[in-house]
Amino acid sequence: LLLFPRLAAVAEVAWSSPTEKRWDRFLMTLDNYQERWEMKGIQPSRAMYNIGHEVVPSFGGLRVSLNCVRPDGEIRYTTDGSEPHRYSSIYRRPWIVKKTQVIKCATFKDGEQMGQTLVLPIRMNPVTGRNLLRSNPIERRMVNGVRGSLKCTDGEWASWAKNDSIVLTFDVGSHKGLHHLLLGCLNN
């Protein structure tokens, strides 16, 4: 339940003076609360352990960056589509992907998986990682090889207002024949 970590955060903000508010100390307090809640049969949300990502064109490939709001967890990942485990590679810095692959990652603490597994299927095609002429940072997502999910908050969707008109020009680098174009849309 997301309610329980949020209630603890509200209490911390209300009861602590501004000079006493420290994120690292709050995390330790929250860990103690979580142990108590679990002993009472309450399953608090572990969303703070979930991983955020950014996949952007870079150096002829895609730069993959991972992050978590919890600085005390280890992000472990695989690039072969297998589930991450306590002995999987530890994420230390962004890396460049140049081929189709499935990245799976999760946050671990003391060898235990804490958050949900993030699955990033990266698909390479003639447009992946290429320049978009006249692009803004949001439109770069359209050539990052990651398809948006049904969750519009996954960071993979570009949006325009109803009166916006867009023109996307893809630079494929040479005269290559494109046989078909697949464009995913989520209409609100």
What are these regions, as identified by a protein language model?
Residues K176-N188:
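A short beta-strand element within beta-rich, extracytoplasmic domains
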Residues S17, K21, L27-L168:
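Short, compositionally stereotyped local motifs that mark structural "simplifiers"
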Residues L1-K21:
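Active-site core of glycosidic bond-cleaving carbohydrate-active enzymes
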Residues V167-H179:
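Extracellular and analogous surface-interaction loops
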